[in-house]
Amino acid sequence: MTLRSCETFLRRSLRFSTALNLTAFPEHEQLYLRVSSGCSVFRPQTVRKCLFHWTPACTVSQGVFLDRLQKGAAVTDESLCNQPVSVSPDRAQQFSLLMKDPDQPENAKSLKVAIVGSPNAGKSTLTNQLLGRKLFAVSSKVHTTRSRAVGVLTENDTQIVLLDTPGLTTQIKAKRHQLENSLLVDPFKSLKEADLVVVLVDVSDKWTRSKLSYEVLKCLALNPDVPAVLVLNKVDLLKNKALLLDITAQLTEGMVNGKKIRIHGASKPVRKAAAGANSRLKEKKAAGSLEDEADHEDKLKALKSHGGWPHFKDVFMLSSIDHEDVETLKRYLFVAAKPCQWQYHSEVLTDQSPEDVCFNTIREKLLQNLPKEVPYTMTQEIEVWKESEDGVLDISIKLYVQKETHMKMVIGPGGQLITRINQEAGNDLMKIFLCNVRLKISVKLRK
């Protein structure tokens, strides 16, 4: 199916084989979804008798789409991953596991997925949901993820490698905010390695939801041979659900999987893709036009006039409160996996060291609790990392701040804030390492 709204929308609808020719009576047209694969979906509670036909284009009926989207019940089960894998708190053991030869099954399949998008689109949250546990730091502030990290999801004979990338930003912003070079280069490197690209868009952000950034389009254009899917995130936070139809049309430029989509009820016309620019980009292999990014900046500039990408293979819509939507995307990834040797042993959950996991977890709490630039200026240092005689992992972290005012902010009145940060970070680390953790965070002014 070319447009995959989400499992929540379709789970109570009838589904027919693509070999059937289906249609419904014209007076019930608002009750079903027509897609390019040649099947129709309608609500059996309302329509009892129908005739059928095939339709060559993807048409989304606004009535049934909004009805199912608004009535979908929230699912709170977080068990998306069946394996209770943990990250080893011992650096040597974690490194040894990463170096261990994969335990290849007989019919091994694999898929490497790069998750890209603008800062704060929800990339790390989605990665955590797919893995079935919280592993990567998330916060409401931008640039929570500072460098690429790998999450590994292994089930039966299939391994999905998730590349969680920093939010795409510009060189000007990186220089202005003194951001690490990894925020600029890691997303592009990830796409070169990927078998599939997931472009994540936060539809609750009215400033960015209707247009893909130049950086996202540039990533896609430089890797036209890598299949890409569009994921609209946080759809439950969008009050006017009818806007989802317009957003889909704008971000795909009216094309999904090589076919035009028609959306009933869309209030804005879909801008046609600039054929010249896209054809030049697709001729990359023949002309070698994009092998050297610097030499072909003029062609990439043509992307600035675009708001969408007409080469998405599929479209998903995710709710932050309904995990069935994530489960649908997860199943899609497993189906898309190809016969290929595994890259990691089945016990590997991430390529991060336990120290990096700890630093990122604490940093998440600092970002959540401190204002403006304060958490971005802090550095961490490990003082103690050892297992005590009672089997508890003792971790002592020294937090360095640049100003005395920042120190007062971190400590909080009566030490309440640093105590809360310590407790929350410690609880998260216990869930990641699957062992008791005794965390101690102290604050010091860097001179």
From Swiss-Prot:
Region spans: G3: 164-167
Main location group: mitochondrion
Residues covered by the Era-type G domain: 109-340
Membrane topology term: Peripheral membrane protein
Region G1, annotated ranges: 117-124
Residue ranges, annotated region (G4): 233-236
Location in or out of the cell: Mitochondrion matrix; Mitochondrion inner membrane
SUPFAM superfamilies: P-loop containing nucleoside triphosphate hydrolases, Prokaryotic type KH domain (KH-domain type II)
This protein's UniProt keywords: GTP-binding, Membrane, Mitochondrion, Mitochondrion inner membrane, Nucleotide-binding, Ribosome biogenesis, RNA-binding, rRNA-binding, Transit peptide
Region G2: start-end pairs: 143-147
Pfam families to which the protein is assigned, alphabetical: KH_2 (PF07650), MMR_HSR1 (PF01926)
CDD domains linked to this entry: Era, KH-II_Era
GO molecular function: GTP binding; ribosomal small subunit binding; rRNA binding
Transit sequence range: 1-18
KH type-2 domain: residues covered: 370-447
Region (G5): 318-320
Biological-process GO terms, alphabetical: ribosomal small subunit assembly
GO cellular component: mitochondrial inner membrane; mitochondrial matrix
Annotated binding of GTP, by residue: 117-124, 164-168, 233-236
Alphabetical list of HAMAP family matching this protein: GTPase_Era
Function summary: Probable GTPase that plays a role in the mitochondrial ribosomal small subunit assembly. Specifically binds the 12S mitochondrial rRNA (12S mt-rRNA) to a 33 nucleotide section delineating the 3' terminal stem-loop region. May act as a chaperone that protects the 12S mt-rRNA on the 28S mitoribosomal subunit during ribosomal small subunit assembly.
Family: Belongs to the TRAFAC class TrmE-Era-EngA-EngB-Septin-like GTPase superfamily. Era GTPase family.
Name used for this protein in its record: GTPase Era, mitochondrial
Gene: eral1
